[in-house]
């Protein structure tokens, strides 16, 4: 697991209050990890802060799984 994946997973655990073992690459924030729309906004904000990047709203809407978050950060940081 890369340091980006580890950092993304840590943020997801902190923001959503889930167990680390529940954070799998294919896990959906809403369906699998129980996030609501506010949780996902806060999660994107935490990712922006951690990786010092800006995620436009239209891109943020596409980030719905753990892997999609990792892929976005890898491509834009």
Curated annotation (Swiss-Prot):
Residues annotated with O-(pantetheine 4'-phosphoryl)serine modification: 37
GO cellular component term of the entry, any: cytosol
Post-translational modification note: 4'-phosphopantetheine is transferred from CoA to a specific serine of apo-ACP by AcpS. This modification is essential for activity because fatty acids are bound in thioester linkage to the sulfhydryl of the prosthetic group.
Keyword set includes Transport: no
Molecular function as annotated in GO: acyl binding; acyl carrier activity
InterPro entries, per database record: ACP (IPR003231), ACP-like_sf (IPR036736), PP-bd_ACP (IPR009081), Ppantetheine_attach_site (IPR006162)
GO annotation (BP), single: lipid A biosynthetic process
Carrier domain sequence ranges: 2-77
Major localization listed first in the record, in broad terms: cytoplasm
Family note: Belongs to the acyl carrier protein (ACP) family.
Protein name (record): Acyl carrier protein
């Amino acid at each position: 697991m890369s340091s980006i994946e580890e950092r993304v997973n840590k943020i997801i655990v902190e923001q959503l209050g889930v167990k680390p073992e529940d954070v799998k690459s294919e896990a959906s924030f809403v369906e699998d990890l129980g996030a609501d729309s506010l949780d996902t906004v806060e999660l994107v904000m935490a990712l922006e802060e951690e990786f010092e990047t800006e995620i436009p709203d239209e891109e943020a809407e596409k980030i719905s799984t753990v892997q999609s978050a990792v892929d976005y950060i890898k491509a834009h940081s």
